[in-house]
């Protein structure tokens, strides 16, 4: 038999080479397996190394944080200071030498001491201002600029002393001179402003708005003209002669030795146009001032004083408010702008001294106003206008010539004046009902005239349906008063407003569009019906003074309308004045 080697035909050398190759393949496979194992170990080591690096970085950050915390705990605190003066780099003055006299520095107030300190190179001196707070390091070097102190004592500006100082009045009327901080140097300050001051450094830090003062003085440019006021032609003419003539022709007044009036008193029943006239005066003065100066942008100012709100429980506060009002007026008038100071309900503030029942505040308020009015003498652009429906209660010293020179009584409107007022509210641009227009062939103006005429006739009729009150005088005479005796411009406006509401309701319910004469007549009836309970019979004489029925003393009032309704027709009132009562 043949052997396998013999069968394969291989020589021993070939057989040995084949065996070596087989061994080499096995070794390669073993090495490959080892390489894979080493790669896995390397990947695991790399992952572990990444985790270790992250942990080391976290530990390093924590160590740094703890180190910074320890450093901060051991760091000395910063102190605060207030800048009094900034000293930029400058040339040495004769006799002065050293770094403090030439290098950048700042005078500050720190811990009750005034010091001159240096600035950190990181701090720009141009970004610092006087009165500002700064941070100081342990070496008392300015390292940062802060804001302004937000708390301080309150003081009132009395007078400016140059561009950077002011005279202020603090507690207990204590006066002191303060310097203005950088924040205030850029603002326009006026007398009466409230300032927050730092009493330690002597700086005024900021302007404090005081709503209780601002609400008392309402500055506005009125847009009401004399043409907007109806039924007061004679009174308007009297006021224009008193106010505008001296303003338009000052040379003629000087030639004749006349002075312009300082004030006007408008008195009469409520709702008859006293406030409207005051606003129209301010508007007219502005127009005349613009014509004279050629400055179309010249404004007028109407200081509407809310009289009763001036009263204050603290002694001297009301007088301070009055001084503030006239200081504001002088400020506005200093540039040539006309200023009207309007005191509404003047009797509530300036009543006759000695007539107060429970207080005597008028004994100091009235003299304060008198001194301010006399002080207006040197100003050509300020005029005081007072309005009241109880002029008999105003102190006579205010009403004398030289103070409120012109006294104008605003009467209740008669039929002609009422028609003029109606024409201000019933205008051709309103929608009118087709039936009313058809009665006048579609002529809108004729329709308006007819509506006004019929409405006025209904209001001023003296038949029994318009009887309102029967008054009995002290001498025994009686008089019947009608609704027309209590008419006013405000009532006329209310009648027209009611009629317009009725027209709107008809449009929404029955699709009948437009104002009708029936709406106006119905509004008149409803307006009068609302006045049935209005007469105050607790003191008929006082009520008559306010309503405008002055003359013989009234002792008894009988309400006719209530009598018709089946209620109590009236009652006699005991009108003997009590102690201290002023009638």
UniProtKB/Swiss-Prot annotation:
GO terms for biological process: modification-dependent protein catabolic process; proteasomal protein catabolic process. GO terms for cellular component: proteasome complex. Keywords: ATP-binding, Chaperone, Coiled coil, Nucleotide-binding, Proteasome. It comes from the Bacteria. The keyword ATP-binding applies. SMART domains: AAA. InterPro entries: AAA+_ATPase, AAA_ATPase_domain, ATPase_AAA_core, ATPase_AAA_CS, NA-bd_OB-fold, P-loop_NTPase, Prot_ATP_ID_OB_2nd, Prot_ATP_ID_OB_N. Residues 1-19 have a biased composition (Polar residues). ATPase which is responsible for recognizing, binding, unfolding and translocation of pupylated proteins into the bacterial 20S proteasome core particle. May be essential for opening the gate of the 20S proteasome via an interaction with its C-terminus, thereby allowing substrate entry and access to the site of proteolysis. Thus, the C-termini of the proteasomal ATPase may function like a 'key in a lock' to induce gate opening and therefore regulate proteolysis. ATP binds at residues 271-276. This is Proteasome-associated ATPase. One of its GO terms (molecular function) is ATP hydrolysis activity. Belongs to the AAA ATPase family. Residues 24-75 form a coiled coil. Residues 1-22 are annotated as: Disordered. Consists of three main regions, an N-terminal coiled-coil domain that binds to protein Pup and functions as a docking station, an interdomain involved in ARC hexamerization, and a C-terminal ATPase domain of the AAA type. The keyword Coiled coil applies. Homohexamer. Assembles into a hexameric ring structure that caps the 20S proteasome core. Strongly interacts with the prokaryotic ubiquitin-like protein Pup through a hydrophobic interface; the interacting region of ARC lies in its N-terminal coiled-coil domain. There is one Pup binding site per ARC hexamer ring. Upon ATP-binding, the C-terminus of ARC interacts with the alpha-rings of the proteasome core, possibly by binding to the intersubunit pockets. Residues 582-583 are annotated as: Docks into pockets in the proteasome alpha-ring. HAMAP family: ARC_ATPase (MF_02112). The gene is arc. Pfam families: AAA, Prot_ATP_ID_OB_C, Prot_ATP_ID_OB_N. Pathway: Protein degradation; proteasomal Pup-dependent pathway.
């Amino acid at each position: 038999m043949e052997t396998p080697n013999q069968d394969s035909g291989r020589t021993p050398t070939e057989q040995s080479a084949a065996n070596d190759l087989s061994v080499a393949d096995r070794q390669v496979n073993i090495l490959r397996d080892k390489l894979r194992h080493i790669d896995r170990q390397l990947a695991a080591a790399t992952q572990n190394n990444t985790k270790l690096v992250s942990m080391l970085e976290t530990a390093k950050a924590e160590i740094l944080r703890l180190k910074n915390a320890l450093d901060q705990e051991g760091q000395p605190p910063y102190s605060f200071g207030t800048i009094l003066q900034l000293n930029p780099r400058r040339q040495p003055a004769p006799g002065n030498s050293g770094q403090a006299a030439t290098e950048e520095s700042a005078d500050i107030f720190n811990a009750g001491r005034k010091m001159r300190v240096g600035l950190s190179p990181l701090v720009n001196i141009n970004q610092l201002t006087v009165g500002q707070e700064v941070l100081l390091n342990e070496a008392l070097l300015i390292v940062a600029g802060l804001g302004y102190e937000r708390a301080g004592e309150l003081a009132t500006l009395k007078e400016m002393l140059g561009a950077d100082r002011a005279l202020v009045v603090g507690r207990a009327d204590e006066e002191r001179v303060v310097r203005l901080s950088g924040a205030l140097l850029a603002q326009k300050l006026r007398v009466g402003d409230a300032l927050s001051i730092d009493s330690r450094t002597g700086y005024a830090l900021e302007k404090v708005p005081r709503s209780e003062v601002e609400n008392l003085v309402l500055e506005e440019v009125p847009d009401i003209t004399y043409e907007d006021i109806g039924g007061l032609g004679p009174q308007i003419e009297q006021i224009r002669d008193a106010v505008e003539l001296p303003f338009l022709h000052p040379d003629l007044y000087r030639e004749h030795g006349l002075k312009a009036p300082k004030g006007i008193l408008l008195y009469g029943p409520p709702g008859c146009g006293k406030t409207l006239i005051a606003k129209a005066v301010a508007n007219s003065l502005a127009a005349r001032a613009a014509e004279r100066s050629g400055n179309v942008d010249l404004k007028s100012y109407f200081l509407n004083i809310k009289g009763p709100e001036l009263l204050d429980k603290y002694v001297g506060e009301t007088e301070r408010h009055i001084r503030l009002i006239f200081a504001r007026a002088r400020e506005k008038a200093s540039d040539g702008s006309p200023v009207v100071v309007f005191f509404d309900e003047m009797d509530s503030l300036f009543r006759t001294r000695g007539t107060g029942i429970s207080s005597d505040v008028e004994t100091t308020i009235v003299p304060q106003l008198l001194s301010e009015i006399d002080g207006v003498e040197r100003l050509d652009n300020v005029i005081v206008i007072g309005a009241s429906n109880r002029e008999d209660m105003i102190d006579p010293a205010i009403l004398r010539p030289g103070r409120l020179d012109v006294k104008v009584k605003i009467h209740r409107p008669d039929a002609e004046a009422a028609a003029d007022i109606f024409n201000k509210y019933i205008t051709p641009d309103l929608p009118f009902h087709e039936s009313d227009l058809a009665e006048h062939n579609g002529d809108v103006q004729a329709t308006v005239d007819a509506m006004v005429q019929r409405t006025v006739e209904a209001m001023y009729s003296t038949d029994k349906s318009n009887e309102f009150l029967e008054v009995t005088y002290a001498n025994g005479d009686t008089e019947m008063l009608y609704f027309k005796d209590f008419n006013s411009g405000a009532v006329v406006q209310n009648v027209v407003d009611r009629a317009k509401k009725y027209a709107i309701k008809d449009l929404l319910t029955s699709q009948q569009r437009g104002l009708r004469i029936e709406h106006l007549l119905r509004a008149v009836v409803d307006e009068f019906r609302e006045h049935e309970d209005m007469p105050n019979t607790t003191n008929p004489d006082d009520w008559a003074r306010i309503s405008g029925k002055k003359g013989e003393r009234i002792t008894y009032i009988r309400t006719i309308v209530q009598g018709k309704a089946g209620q109590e027709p009236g009652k006699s009132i005991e009108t003997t004045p009590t102690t201290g009562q002023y009638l």
